Regions:
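Charge-rich, well-structured scaffold segments of protease-associated domains
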Residues: 2, 10, 43-44, 101-253, ...
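Bacterial N-terminal signal peptides
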Residues: 7-17
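Mature N-terminal segment immediately following signal peptide/propeptide cleavage
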Residues: 25-66
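Residues that act as N-cap/strand-start positions at coil-to-secondary-structure junctions
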Residues: 33-36, 266, 426
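Structural beta-strand/beta-sheet cores of well-ordered domains, especially the beta-sheet scaffolds
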Residues: 38, 60-62, 79, 85, ...
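Active/ligand-binding-proximal structured segments within catalytic/core domains
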Residues: 55-104, 293-305, 312-315
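His/Glu-based metal-binding/catalytic segments typifying zinc-dependent metallopeptidases
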Residues: 167, 183, 252-310
Length: 455
């Protein structure tokens, strides 16, 4: 999930390599170049390719982002995207453990760092490896796009792994509360469903359904291949053509999510009561998609309200000994999502006191606004955190991955240019527009103390 990983254009330009002219390779269309990144399309099937050479170290990251996440699931298949992500490592007729050339065996033998992740709007697969091994990884990654084995004998044990992850989340107070808040806030839109899925769907989804899901979304024209680091652009495009070029476009239109969440007309509340030690309060408000022009100002608002010990929430709550931590986060997703606030209760604190303190601080911002100094400090925080988050080819690819998922990879370069232009007036305006009590969902995590064992 993107957590303020985007940097300012000015900063990005300072750390990017000098831009070279895009290369011309038969079978590709050059789409555009921006900030040291060249975008191409593979003519045979519509695969999007992003190239960003950087020869500062002999390392390259290859990442494939599929535009499918939990927003593409329905009741009965929730968690399918994530379970399929696990099964993508089980091999194919060409690359498998019996042959000694599975993706795990290859990448571990060369010391690569690799993994895959699933989120609301996307699934990604990646490896950071020595430049000389790029072709070997591209070959395996391309192969599993269309030739994956999907066997029931693999589904059953992998399902138990995913179910264990589900149970770990259930035992985390903030994660458990967050799931309930999303489910209450989104009644129609599929952001209602947790990315890991509902337990019964995790346990019961069939291998046939997973195959159907794979055959629906895992196609070149629903994917982006991003290559960042030490490579030659013409040679890299040659590898993409060699290993992806034989695949056709999807034989059907990729299904699009068209469900829109109806306007919320009143506040909603949820309560989670289960074993635990400390309570939580969460308050979320409907917020726009990542590409909306108000999102940068909401990001600045979140930094002012809930980022660090100098933030308004932290100071207001700790002055009253009410909290151990407080945070605010502006949503950065493909569709309208949530502006989220969380506070962990200090021992002895009451939920209602924490909630009231948060709401009072929000009303203060809506009425009186914020200072120019607060805005400047928030922008500086955003700039600095981005610099730390873009350390290396994998870190950069990860940020671009979230921008692809949000609907536009160029947000990697343009988003923080907009953040730099946010004013105190902008922050006050978005606070009044979006932090609307009638569009809020409030949740309490109330720990239940287990009774003492009797002798």
């Amino acid at each position: 999930m993107l957590k303020r990983l985007l940097a300012t254009t000015a900063l990005a330009v300072s750390v990017l390599p000098l831009c070279a002219a895009p290369v011309s390779v038969e079978g590709f269309t050059h789409v555009k170049s921006l900030g040291g990144i060249d975008e191409y399309r593979l003519d045979a099937n519509g695969l999007q390719i992003l190239l960003m050479p950087d020869h500062s170290a002999p390392v390259v990251t290859f990442m494939v982002t599929y535009r499918v996440g939990s927003r593409n699931e329905v009741t009965g298949t929730t968690g399918a995207t994530h379970l399929l992500e696990h099964l993508m490592f089980k091999g194919s007729p060409a690359f498998n453990r019996a042959k000694g050339n599975s993706i795990d065996q290859f990448l571990e033998s060369i010391g690569a760092q690799y993994n895959a992740t699933t989120w609301l709007d996307r699934t990604n697969y990646y490896a950071e490896l020595g430049s000389e091994h790029l072709e070997g990884y591209v070959a395996i990654e391309a192969d599993r796009m269309r030739n994956l084995w999907l066997h029931e004998d693999d589904r059953r044990p992998e399902m138990t792994v995913v179910r264990n992850e589900f149970e770990i989340g259930e035992n985390n107070p903030q994660e458990a509360l967050d799931k309930e808040i999303f489910a209450a806030a989104f009644q129609a839109h599929p952001y209602h469903h947790p990315t890991i899925g509902w337990r019964s769907d995790i346990e019961k989804v069939s291998i046939e359904k997973l195959r159907e899901f794979y055959d629906t979304f895992y196609w070149p024209d629903n994917a982006t291949a991003t290559i960042i680091g030490d490579f030659d652009p013409a040679q890299a495009l040659g590898l993409v053509k060699k290993y992806y070029g034989a695949y056709p476009k999807a034989p059907h239109p990729i299904p699009q999510v068209y469900t829109e969440e109806p306007e919320q007309t009143g506040p909603r509340r949820v309560m989670v009561q289960r074993a635990g030690e400390l309570g939580y309060v969460g308050i979320s408000y409907k917020s726009p998609a990542a590409t909306h022009p108000d999102t940068p100002a909401l990001n600045v608002l979140a930094l002012i309200l809930g980022d660090g010990k100098t933030s308004r929430f932290y100071r207001a709550l700790t002055d009253k000994n009410l909290t151990t931590n407080a945070s605010a986060q502006a949503g950065f997703f493909h569709d309208p999502s949530l502006f989220q606030i969380y506070a962990g209760l200090a021992p002895g604190a009451r939920h209602e006191d924490v909630e009231k303190t948060i709401l009072d601080e929000i009303e203060r911002v809506k009425k009186d606004g914020v200072t120019d100094a607060e805005v400047a400090a928030a922008i500086a925080k955003n700039r600095a955190s981005t610099a730390y988050a873009r350390d290396g080819s994998f870190a950069i690819a990860s940020v671009i991955n979230e921008c692809i998922a949000a609907g536009d990879w160029t947000l990697y370069l343009t988003y923080d240019e907009a953040v730099e232009k946010v004013t105190a007036a902008d922050v006050k305006r978005v606070a009044n527009h979006y932090l609307d009590h009638n569009k809020s969902t409030t949740g309490w995590f109330v720990p239940i103390v287990a009774p003492a064992a009797t002798k």
